[in-house]
């Protein structure tokens, strides 16, 4: 596996070339080879088209998503939630989902030097060309990386500055939203920067958002009209449609048809979407990861995800086994990990471990469990 990766890296190095011409039009992909040449460290970070990526038609997609994890590629590309949502959206007819990550300082400097917007790694389209740009906010310190990515993408940082053009207008900025445990636990510090915030689990919520956006584009709705429609979707919080009450603290809807309280979404884990892509470079979690349990019954007050992801939901043992077996065959990884806030609380763990050992006995693979 490592030998194949090194060979791919050498091929990538051979393919990059130096040029001063960069395509900045939103109608076309960026001139990748002019932007990411041999002067950029680890160019394979930005190549995209990893093992497991399926080509998608930009022109026929009705809604184009770019999901981002606001860290460098080695961190973001191995995030399980990021991969699951990416896979789910690409399984929805008419929807296209690409990925983007925080560029390292050398590429960020070159993007600014050449006035080129940050681009997605598969289509290599500038991020302003997408309909929806989503950020995973997993911890507070990631917020500044989001602002950096918005600036690099040449998207107005504050939601109030993004105008009211219909999303179908080429000049309209994409819808900017955040999700993840930090955005769910306390969205208000980040509210000025997002058109909406997705609260709770996204597996079922994001496809619903995509359907609303597709209809809004077909109807030619303005940005504000679309946000009014999105606010009716359970789990979607639109900060611009809420204001503080008389006490200056409590949030109240500005329109009577809006929900007074936005509740987070709770979804059933979908391990069959967890089969990740095999990156061109080594990542922080360089293995297959399959979720076996979401939530926790311990109730430790210091544990944010344990308090937020309730109730605890176990994945069916056979679904875990099939996801691991399929994923190992498709990726070629030699290691896999079973993920949970507390793996020892997954009652089927011994039986799953024995069955996986029996099925994968001749493949010389290693099981890792989080501490």
Language model features with spans:
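N-terminal [4Fe-4S]-dependent radical SAM core
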Residues: 36-66, 73-74, 239, 244-289
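Low-complexity, highly charged intrinsically disordered N-terminal segments
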Residues: 65, 70, 76-87, 91-98, ...
């Amino acid at each position: 596996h490592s030998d194949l990766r090194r060979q791919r890296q050498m091929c990538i190095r051979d393919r990059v070339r130096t040029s001063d011409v960069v395509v900045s039009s939103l109608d076309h992909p960026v001139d990748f080879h002019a932007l990411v040449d041999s002067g950029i460290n680890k160019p394979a970070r930005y190549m995209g088209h990893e093992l497991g990526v399926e080509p998608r038609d930009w022109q026929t997609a009705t809604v184009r998503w770019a999901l981002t994890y606001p860290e460098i590629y080695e961190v973001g590309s191995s995030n399980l939630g990021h991969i699951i949502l990416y896979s789910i959206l690409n399984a929805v007819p008419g929807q296209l989902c690409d990925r983007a990550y925080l560029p390292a300082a050398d590429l960020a400097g070159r993007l600014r030097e050449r006035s080129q917007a940050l681009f997605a790694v598969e289509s290599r389209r500038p991020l302003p060309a997408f309909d929806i740009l989503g950020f995973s906010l997993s911890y507070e310190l990631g917020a500044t990386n989001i602002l950096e990515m918005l600036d690099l993408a040449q998207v107005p940082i504050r939601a109030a500055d993004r105008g009211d053009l219909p999303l179908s207008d080429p000049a309209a900025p994409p819808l900017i939203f955040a999700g993840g445990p930090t955005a769910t636990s306390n969205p208000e510090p980040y509210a000025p920067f997002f058109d909406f915030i997705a609260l709770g689990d996204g597996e079922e919520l994001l496809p619903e958002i995509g359907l609303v956006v597709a209809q809004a584009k077909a109807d030619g709705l303005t940005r504000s009209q679309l946000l009014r429609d999105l606010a009716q979707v359970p789990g979607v919080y639109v900060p611009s449609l809420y204001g503080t009450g008389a006490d200056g603290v409590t949030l109240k809807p500005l329109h009577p048809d809006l929900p007074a309280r936005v509740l987070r979404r709770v979804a059933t884990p979908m391990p069959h979407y967890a089969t990740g892509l095999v990156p061109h470079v080594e990542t922080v979690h360089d293995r297959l990861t399959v979720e076996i349990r979401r939530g926790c019954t311990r109730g430790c007050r210091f544990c944010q995800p344990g308090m937020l992801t309730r109730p605890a939901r176990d994945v069916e043992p056979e679904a875990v086994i099939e996801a691991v077996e399929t994923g190992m065959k498709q990726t070629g990884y030699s290691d896999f990990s079973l993920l949970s806030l507390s793996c020892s609380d997954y009652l089927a763990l011994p039986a799953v471990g024995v069955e996986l050992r029996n099925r994968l006995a001749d493949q010389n693979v290693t099981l890792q469990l989080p501490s």
